Amino acid sequence: MNISKLNYFFTIIVLSNISFFIGANYFPDENWNSASPESQGIASSKVKKLIDLTFLDDATQGVVIIKNGVIVGEKYADSHNMLSHGTSWSMAKSYYAALIGISIEKGEIQSLDDPVVKYLDYFNDERKNITIRDLLDMSSGLEFPDHEHEKMFFQESHLDYAKSVKYEKDPGTKFEYNNANSMILGDILYVATNKKADILLEERILKPIGITDYKL
């Protein structure tokens, strides 16, 4: 597989064992090595079962299964292949989390426990005790109305919608998957770095790890 051609925005990557990142001799470059499941200590039947499960709902565009740093299983929907571009959807949440971590390492953000209001003045209301950690943990306590995901999706400005979401419960008390949290994280990154999240993603994640075939 040519990693420069692989679009991480649509491919689901299942890490059956992530410990290879620590002290491993092999790390993928432009050509990611493949191997039989058995050579990596896993049965082919289990890999096939996992792949079949991911395609049951006809919504999966592609899946890659990695064991010990090598590809042991790979399949794409009929309308896609390893060169296809797709929509990342909620993968953005993982990218936001990584970018927040990088900003902390660079000293642009002091701590996960910083209150959001330290960076965003518009949180100086009943939301003032919400922290960056609460946003990342999906426990911000921001209101989560029925069909929130659909409501945000069809707004002209997703950020403006997220800014308007009201306080509902104490932060850190309940996990509630809420897209508004991620939009607020993007705004924090902009204030801390003076760069939009898509630019940060390109500069700090995609280019450094060699991903060249993408659309933002």
Please provide the spans of the model-predicted regions:
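Bacterial N-terminal signal peptides
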Residues: 10-18
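Catalytic-site signature segments of enzymes, centered on catalytic residues
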Residues: 145-216
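Short, compositionally biased leader-like segments
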Residues: 24-43
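A short, well-structured edge-of-sheet supersecondary motif
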Residues: 50-80
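Extended ligand-binding groove/face enriched in aromatic
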Residues: 87, 100, 122-168
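Active-site helix/loop module of the DD-peptidase/beta-lactamase fold
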Residues: 106-140, 164, 193-216
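Bacterial N-terminal signal peptides that target proteins for export
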Residues: 1-10
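Active-site SXXK
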Residues: 69, 86-112, 135, 185-189
